[in-house]
Amino acid sequence: MPLLEGYGMTETCGPVCVSLPENNRIGTIGMPMSGVTAGIADDGELCVRGHLVCRGYHNHPDVTAEQIVDGWLHTGDLGDIDEDGFISITGRKKDLIITAGGKNVSPGLLEAAVMTSPVVNQCLVIGDRKPFVAALVTLDLADANAWLKSQGAQEESDLASLARNPIVHTEVERAVNQANEGVSRAESIRKFEILPDEFTQDNGMLTASLKTRRAQIVAHHRELIDTVIYVPKKK
């Protein structure tokens, strides 16, 4: 069954970009619809304007002034427009990581690439104001054990044991290296840690819509991040 991507927001009263059966490119959201213009701001944010963009936010003129500038709606999404006009979404602006070296890194693409591994459940890329990019990885007990069995290896009884398993570590490393092939060296994951637990709603690491709560995860694993991943330099 053919599946085609599109893009829209509440603020655009429906879709602003669509992929057509006769004109599409895998990995993109297609081209702007008739009457819609799209552009990429200096910070990488996708902006759109046209008759579909709402007039503003009811009773919130301050938000309207911030989000809609000279008719351009700032979507909050990071994106690219290729030479043929096809648009790709690369992440969320609020999730953007800026390393200590000033490199802007969109974590979403890296995270998605790492999570293609059959053993990985979740991945959180970190590195804001840090010297390099790193990742926190969680495992799926059932899927990881199924993969171990397919490799002729012994299954593990819990996530903590899985996290210490050298075969699993090698598989996660493979996934990280593969993810790094799609980005520059400055954007690549230099270190990763496999966690002995998962991000869940119960432990406050996921929202009700199952999105990762980045700030909470970083705060919870602060000691690991500051003493293991980013080892302080000896004075």
Which role fits each region the language model picked out?
Residues 1-24, 37, 121:
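Gly/Ser/Thr-rich phosphate-binding loop
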Residues 9-12, 75, 99-100, 207:
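Ser/Thr-glycine-rich phosphate-binding loops at phosphate-binding pockets of nucleotides
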Residues 122-124, 131, 173-235:
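Conserved C-terminal "lid"/linker of ANL adenylate-forming enzymes
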